[in-house]
UniProtKB/Swiss-Prot annotation:
<keyword id="KW-0238">DNA-binding</keyword>
<dbReference type="GO" id="GO:0006274">
    <property type="term" value="P:DNA replication termination"/>
</dbReference>
<comment type="function">
    <text>Trans-acting protein required for termination of DNA replication. Binds to DNA replication terminator sequences (terA to terF) to prevent the passage of replication forks. The termination efficiency will be affected by the affinity of this protein for the terminator sequence.</text>
</comment>
<dbReference type="GO" id="GO:0005737">
    <property type="term" value="C:cytoplasm"/>
</dbReference>
<comment type="similarity">
    <text>Belongs to the Tus family.</text>
</comment>
<dbReference type="InterPro" id="IPR008865">
    <property type="entry name" value="DNA_replication_term_site-bd"/>
</dbReference>
<dbReference type="GO" id="GO:0003677">
    <property type="term" value="F:DNA binding"/>
</dbReference>
<dbReference type="InterPro" id="IPR036381">
    <property type="entry name" value="Tus_dom1"/>
</dbReference>
<dbReference type="Pfam" id="PF05472">
    <property type="entry name" value="Ter"/>
</dbReference>
<keyword id="KW-0963">Cytoplasm</keyword>
<dbReference type="InterPro" id="IPR036384">
    <property type="entry name" value="Tus_sf"/>
</dbReference>
<protein>
    <recommendedName>
        <fullName>DNA replication terminus site-binding protein</fullName>
    </recommendedName>
</protein>
<keyword id="KW-0235">DNA replication</keyword>
Length: 311
């Protein structure tokens, strides 16, 4: 597919996404609200995106105002939806849950529109991250040339429906994304960045080429069978733990935006018990079990690329 077809399809899918999000807003707004609870987190200011987070103060909102904030949040996809002082590199987060009473027919209608919305989100992400063929550092320019001010992470995030949950409780998760990669994978990625011939701020084009060339040399010097890992820290994330009494099952969901709980009237489903998201303080985090990690040596800091050392 040529570049212009790809851009046209991206713009078309995004227009469809805006329509389905509006339809979802209308559908949910017409349903009887039985409870709503959302947790506002501090905005991340420009220039502070990479600072370690040690404390987060949470503000709780309930009822109709929480529902209004939650429904608005699903449609906050652009930078102009937030203040000028807020970082464009940090996604907006509004954990919480909106609980609606539904008939069986209403549930099916809502599930259909949520499914369609999530399919469009997944397709947009695939177009931008895979089909464009661009390395990550060039995607920003590609997206903002055609969808100016789009916050991609907010756009990609899926909407999570819950059916007749018994309780929804909230907490915080600290973790790393760990991925095994091959020497060839990394060299291919670096060659693609080198051949693109563009500057990536704050570097000039020549400085960027020099940096990538040094990284390629470092990787090429490794033995072919070297075990490599990308170990990237993820900033502390709000999560929801959902309990289903009938199935005796707990499901944990990432919760960057409100979950949508549907309580079926015909089934006599009761209002789920709702927990609170408490303030985060890194000093009070307790690890239930922390296994010994294999020793690693940092090779390419920019990519969080490590060499696994033999014990």
């Amino acid at each position: 597919m040529n570049k212009y077809d790809l851009i046209e399809r991206m713009n078309t899918r995004f227009a469809e996404l805006e329509v389905t999000l509006h339809q979802l807003h209308q559908q949910l707004d017409d349903l009887p609200l039985i409870a709503a609870r959302v947790f506002s987190l501090p905005e991340i200011e420009k220039g502070t995106e990479h600072q370690p987070i040690e404390q987060i103060t949470v503000n709780i909102t309930e009822g109709e105002h929480a529902k209004k904030l939650g429904l608005q949040h699903f449609q906050r996809l652009f930078l102009h939806h937030q203040g000028q002082h807020v970082s464009s590199k940090a996604a907006l987060r509004l954990p919480g849950v909106l609980c609606f009473s539904v008939t069986d027919k209403e549930l099916i209608e809502c599930q259909d529109i949520i499914k369609k919305t999530n399919q469009l989100k997944a397709e947009l992400e695939h177009i931008i991250t895979v089909e464009s063929g661009l390395p990550s550092e060039q995607r920003f320019e590609f997206v903002h040339t055609h969808l100016h001010g789009l916050i991609t992470l907010n756009t990609y995030r899926t909407i999570t429906p819950l059916i007749n949950p018994s309780s929804v409780r909230f907490g915080w998760a600290n973790k790393h994304i760990i991925k095994n990669v091959t020497r060839e994978d990394i060299l291919l990625q670096l060659e693609k960045s080198l051949n693109a011939g563009r500057a990536v701020p704050p570097f000039t084009r020549e400085q960027w080429r020099e940096l990538i060339s040094l990284e390629i040399n470092d990787v090429q010097r490794l033995p072919e069978k070297t075990r490599l890992k990308i170990k990237r820290p993820v900033k502390v994330q709000p999560i929801a733990r959902v309990w289903y009494q009938e199935q005796q099952k707990q499901v944990q969901h990432p919760c960057p935006m409100p979950l949508i709980a549907f309580c079926q009237r015909q089934s006599g489903a009761e209002l789920p018990k709702l927990g609170e998201l408490t303030d985060y303080d890194v000093k009070h985090i307790k690890h239930k079990y922390k296994p010994d990690a294999k020793p690693l040596r940092l090779l390419v800091p920019r990519l969080h690329l490590y060499v696994e050392l033999e014990p």
